[in-house]
Amino acid sequence: MHFLATAAVLAGVGLASAYTVPANLQQIYNKHKTGTCQNKLQDGFSDGISGSRSFAYCGDIEGAIFLHSSANGGQYVNMDIDCDGANNSAGDCANDPSGQSMTAFMDTVKQYGISDLDANIHPYVVFGNSGSSPTFDPQQYGMEPLSVMAVVCNNQLFYGIWGDTNGGTSTGEASISLAKLCFPNDGITGDNGHGEEDVLYIGFMGQDAVPGASAAWTARDTKTFEESIKALGDRLVAKLSA
């Protein structure tokens, strides 16, 4: 599931499916990046690279949860690569040293006509930690499995789903398809992600964030799935305030 990223940090030109960061979300990004989190739901996590456990799940945005660290004057987190799920060794996931054949919500997603999420197609975020101390379960704060998440990366907005959890204490991880949307010029593979702590992951509380059968779960490409959850993502982001 998790790997030590060897990041390339070149800023890439966004793909056609990138969305402009709306003004309210840009304000949130700028406001909360610096400083400290006032409402730490759980701290003591790492980014999977440095070993520093300065990262926390933060509740400073009403109705949402995001990852933040007070280190270095305040920062978000990186984007390590997750290849778990169906076809976990396919394509650029072939060199993933820790890929697993299932995701945390495999049993739930089966109702939508697929055996599991495919990291090469479905843009999902790894959010929540179990198996090591500390732990964090987003469901205890109202997040629902397979709910839409907003990801601000490389000065763009993308939508993903909450699709997996981490068995250790590291944070900042997403499916390879989401990472390629964010950083198309970084040479993303199962063993190479984005190391800068500048990615904002936002999870939304409530059943309203779950796309259910309206999402294109059986899509054969990432863009098709991404577009199927955009309208819901836009509505969720529009409700956010700094």
From Swiss-Prot:
It is found in: Secreted. It catalyses: Endohydrolysis of beta-(1->4)-linkages between D-glucosamine residues in a partly acetylated chitosan. Keywords: Allergen, Carbohydrate metabolism, Glycoprotein, Glycosidase, Hydrolase, Polysaccharide degradation, Secreted, Signal. Its EC number is 3.2.1.132. One of its GO terms (cellular component) is extracellular region. Residues 1-18 form the signal peptide. Its main location: secreted. PANTHER family: ENDO-CHITOSANASE. Belongs to the glycosyl hydrolase 75 family. This is Endo-chitosanase. It comes from Aspergillus fumigatus (strain ATCC MYA-4609 / CBS 101355 / FGSC A1100 / Af293) (Neosartorya fumigata). The gene is csn.
